[in-house]
Amino acid sequence: VDEAAPPAALKALALRLLETGLTISWWGNIRFEEAFSPDLARLLAASGCIALTAGLEAASDRLLERMKKGITVDQTARVAAAFHQAGILVHAYLMYGCPGETIADTVDSLERVRQLFANHLLQSAFWHKFTATAHSPIGLNPAAEGLTILGPTFEGFAENDLRHADPNATCPPWLGEGLRAALLNYMEQAGFDIPSQRWFSHRVKPPRVTKTWLTQALAASSDVPLTAERRCVWIGGRPVIAATGRTRTRVILPTRTEDFTISLASPHTEWLLRFLHESTPSLSRRNHAYPRLAEVRDRFPAAGARGFDRFSRGSAWQSMRQAGLLLV
C-alpha cells in the first residue's frame, strides 16, 4: 500500500473544492513527482492546501535508485521550489543507515538538506534510521542488499516494520546524533554557516556536494510547455473592463495581492472574457470539462492557432498567467 496521493487525484480534489466554494485548510502526503508543476502547486494552494509531506529518504540519487523510489534529488528540489512559490509548507521524511550507504553519503545528504532549508524549500523534516518494511523492494528481497530479516511476521498495514541484520552497516550512533542536531538548527533557520562535517563528534570528510548544487538543480528547471492537452483553469478574480477605446480595451485582472492590467484589441477582449469564464471553477462547471489549450488556440480571434502562438509570447498572456491562469 502506498499512502502517497497521486498528482491527478489531488488535482481533482482541488478543482472540486474550488467548484463547490468550500473553504478549508488541508494537507496531504505525496511523492516528489515532477507532475507537481508550479501551476499544479498554485491550484492546490488556491483550494486550501497549506502543507505537504513527502519522502526525500537518503537524499542521494544512488541510494534512491537502489531503493527504487522513482525520484531524484534534483527533481525533489524543483518540486519543493514549486510548492514554496505557491506558499505551501513542505515537510520531508529523511532516512540514514540505508543498505549500501557510507558515512560520506550521509554527509553529502546533510549538505543537500542544508541548502534546501537555507533557501526555504523545506520548513521541517525528520531524520530516522532505516527500517526495512514488509512490501518495500528491500523487504521483499533482503538478500539482494545483504540483509537478514529477523522478524516479526507481517501483521498488516502500519504493522509492517521488520527487524534486520546488516553485516555491512556503517551507521554508528554518533551519526544520528549529528544529523538530529543539524536538523534542529536548520528548522530554526540557524547553523547554515557551520560546515556539514562539523556537526559530528567524530572526524568525517567534507561533503562532496558543491555549494551551488541547489542553484544548478533549479536552473535546470524549465517552464511548463504549452502542451495542447493541458486544461486551462482560472483562479484569479473576475476581470474588470477599465476603459474602452476605439480599437483597444484595458482590462484589470484582480488577485488577492495585486491587480494586473492588460490592453487588448476589442475582439481579443471578448475572447478573453469568454475564455476566463469557461475556465473558472464553479458549480456549473462540475459536469463540464475545462477548456483544453488546443481548443483555446483554435478559437483565438482572427488568426486562430497561429495568432494565439504570437499572443502567448506577449506581455498580456504573461500577465494572465501571473494573475491566475493555470495550465494543469
Predicted regions and their residues:
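Conserved SAM/AdoMet-binding glycine-rich loop
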Residues: 1-89, 98
